[in-house]
Curated annotation (Swiss-Prot):
Entry-linked SUPFAM superfamilies: P-loop containing nucleoside triphosphate hydrolases (SSF52540)
Chemical reaction(s) catalysed: IMP + L-aspartate + GTP = N(6)-(1,2-dicarboxyethyl)-AMP + GDP + phosphate + 2 H(+)
Major location category of this protein: cytoplasm
Gene designation per UniProt: purA
UniProt keyword annotation of Ligase present: yes
Active site: D13 (proton acceptor), H41 (proton donor)
Matches recorded under InterPro entries: Adenylosuccin_syn_GTP-bd, Adenylosuccin_syn_Lys_AS, Adenylosuccinate_synth_dom1, Adenylosuccinate_synth_dom2, Adenylosuccinate_synth_dom3, Adenylosuccinate_synthetase, P-loop_NTPase
Chain positions recorded as Mg(2+) binding sites: D13, G40
The protein's name in its UniProt record: Adenylosuccinate synthetase
Cofactor mode of binding and number, as noted: Binds 1 Mg(2+) ion per subunit.
Family label: Belongs to the adenylosuccinate synthetase family.
Xref: NCBIfam families: PRK01117.1 (NF002223), purA (TIGR00184)
EC number: 6.3.4.4
Cofactor: Mg(2+)
Length: 429
C-alpha cells in the first residue's frame, strides 16, 4: 500500500488541516517532517475545535504521531500544546507520540533574534512569525544547535551552550541587546527536559519498522511549496524545505518509501505576509474572497492577501514536488461570482512565459495573463459527488486539471470533513 505525502501547492493556508484529518483516519502513522510551530491549522472533530501548530494531527485520533528530525522544536511550546490538548480530553503519552532525538531545539535566543531582525530589516519585511524558526535552522546548518538528544546528556550540555552563546552573544552585542548568560539557557533547557525526554526516539527506526509491518504512513507538510527555501519566492520564504522531497530527509525514511504525493490546492490563491503575488486582487473581488473564505491566519491572525487561481505556480509546484494528484479546496468560496479568472501564463518584459522566474526583480515584474470562465449561481457547499456540482463548477475544476497537469484526487466543498468528493484514494496502490 502507498504511503502519502501531503504538501501545500501554493503559499500555505490551502486547507491542509481538513484533508490531513480526513486522511489520518485511514493512516496508521502521521509524521511532521519540516517547519516548527509557525504554521497552524484547526481540526474540527465532533464539533470540537483543536488548534495545532507543532503536534501532528494524528494525535487527536489516537494514531502514532511523529515529530521528525526536519522539524525545529520549541520545548516550552511543545509542553504548552500537549497540556492544552490534554485539557480537551486527548490522551498524549509515549505510545502515541515520538520526537526525533536529532531534531533541533528552538530557544529564547532564537525568538529574540527573529524579532530583532524583522523589526530592523531595512525595508525588507519577510513576514516571519517571530517564533525563532529561522534562527534555529541557522544554528542547525551552522552545526551549533542544541538538539533534543542533548537534554538526555546534561553533563555535556554546558559546553554546547557555551559554544552556541559565543555566536549569539556576538550578534546580540552588535544589535545592542544584553548578552545572555550560560546559566540562563541551561535553566531554560533543564526546566523542561523531564517533560520532553519520555517522547524521544530514533524515529527513522520506528518508521522503518512500521513501514515493514505494512502500516500506512501519512507525511504531514506545513506551509506551502512556494515558501520552500530553494524553490519558493526567495527571500520571501520560510527557512526549511517545504517541497515533498523533504518528507524523506525530514523523517529518515528513504524516498523509495514514499508513494503518493497529494498537493493541497485552494480554488483561488492566498498569501500571508510580504512577497510577490502576481494574481493579487486589491478590489471588491479580493475582499469578497477574503471575507467569504475567512482568510485570517490561525497562528498570527493576520489577514491574508487574496487573488485568482494561478495555474502557473501550481503547475510549477506539481513538478518540483512530484505531485501525483491534488486536493482542491474551498471551491464553495467561488459560488455566486459572475465570472472567474485563471492565470494561465505571465508576461515578463513583453514576453510570454509559463513559469515563475527565480529572480526577485523578475518576480515583481511579471503580469498575469488570464482566461475568463463563466461563474455559477448555484451552491457547491456541501457537495459530496460530482452530480451535486453545477456544470460550470465542474468545467472550472476540469480546466484546472488540464492547466496544471495533475488530476483532482479529492475535492473539498466546505470546512466539514464529510463534505469531500473522493475521486482517487491516495492510500490505494
Amino acid at each position: 500500500m502507498a504511503n502519502v505525502v501531503v504538501v501545500g501547492s501554493q503559499w500555505g493556508d490551502e486547507g491542509k488541516g481538513k484533508i490531513v484529518d480526513w486522511l489520518s483516519e485511514r493512516a496508521d502513522v502521521i509524521v511532521r517532517y519540516q517547519g516548527g510551530h509557525n504554521a497552524g491549522h484547526t481540526l474540527v472533530i465532533d464539533g470540537v475545535s483543536y488548534k495545532l501548530s507543532l503536534l501532528p494531527s494524528g494525535l487527536v485520533r489516537g494514531k502514532l504521531s511523529v515529530i521528525g528530525n526536519g522539524v525545529v522544536v520549541d520545548p516550552h511550546h511543545f509542553v504548552a500544546e500537549t497540556e492544552k490538548l490534554r485539557a480537551q480530553g486527548i490522551d498524549i503519552n509515549p505510545d502515541v507520540l515520538r520526537i526525533a532525538e536529532n531534531a533541533p531545539l528552538i530557544l529564547s535566543i532564537h525568538r529574540d533574534l527573529d524579532a530583532m531582525r524583522e523589526g530592523s530589516n531595512s525595508g525588507l519585511k519577510i513576514g516571519t512569525t517571530k517564533r525563532g524558526i529561522g534562527p534555529a535552522y541557522e544554528d542547525k546548518v551552522g552545526r551549533r544547535a542544541i538538539r533534543v538528544i542533548d537534554l538526555a546528556e546534561p553533563e555535556t550540555l554546558q559546553p554546547k551552550v557555551e559554544r552556541l552563546l559565543a555566536h549569539h552573544n556576538l550578534l546580540r552585542r552588535g544589535m545592542g541587546l544584553e548578552e545572555i548568560a550560560v546559566e540562563t539557557i541551561l535553566t531554560e533547557l533543564t526546566s523542561v527536559a523531564d517533560q520532553i525526554l519520555p517522547y524521544i526516539d530514533q524515529v527513522w527506526r520506528v518508521l522503518d519498522e512500521r513501514r515493514k509491518a505494512g502500516d500506512r504512513i501519512l507525511f504531514e507538510g506545513a506551509q506551502g511549496a512556494l515558501l520552500d527555501n530553494d524553490h519558493g519566492t526567495y527571500p520571501f520564504v520560510t527557512s526549511s524545505n517545504t517541497v515533498a522531497g523533504q518528507a524523506a530527509a525530514g523523517s529518515g525514511l528513504g524516498p523509495t518509501a514514499i508513494g503518493y504525493v497529494l498537493g493541497i490546492t485552494k480554488a483561488y490563491t492566498t498569501r500571508v505576509g510580504e512577497g510577490p503575488f502576481p494574481t493579487e486582487l486589491n478590489d471588491e473581488i479580493g475582499e469578497f474572497l477574503g471575507t467569504k473564505g475567512h482568510e485570517f491566519g490561525v497562528v498570527t491572525g493576520r489577514k491574508r492577501r487574496c487573488g485568482w487561481f494561478d495555474a502557473v505556480i501550481v503547475r510549477q509546484t506539481v513538478r518540483t514536488s512530484g505531485i501525483t494528484g491534488i486536493a482542491l479546496t474551498k471551491l464553495d468560496v467561488l459560488d455566486g461570482l459572475d465570472e472567474i479568472k485563471i492565470c494561465v501564463a505571465y508576461e515578463l518584459d513583453g514576453k510570454r512565459i509559463d513559469y515563475l522566474p527565480s529572480s526577485m526583480g523578475a518576480q515583481a515584474r511579471v503580469k498575469p495573463i488570464y482566461e475568463t470562465l463563466p461563474g455559477w449561481s448555484e451552491t457547491t457547499a456541501g457537495a459530496r459527488s460530482w452530480n451535486d456540482l453545477p456544470a460550470q463548477a465542474v468545467k472550472y475544476v476540469r480546466h484546472i486539471e488540464e492547466l496544471i497537469g495533475a488530476p483532482v484526487a479529492m475535492l473539498s466543498t466546505s470546512p466539514e470533513r464529510e463534505d469531500t468528493i473522493l475521486v482517487t484514494d491516495p492510500f490505494h496502490d
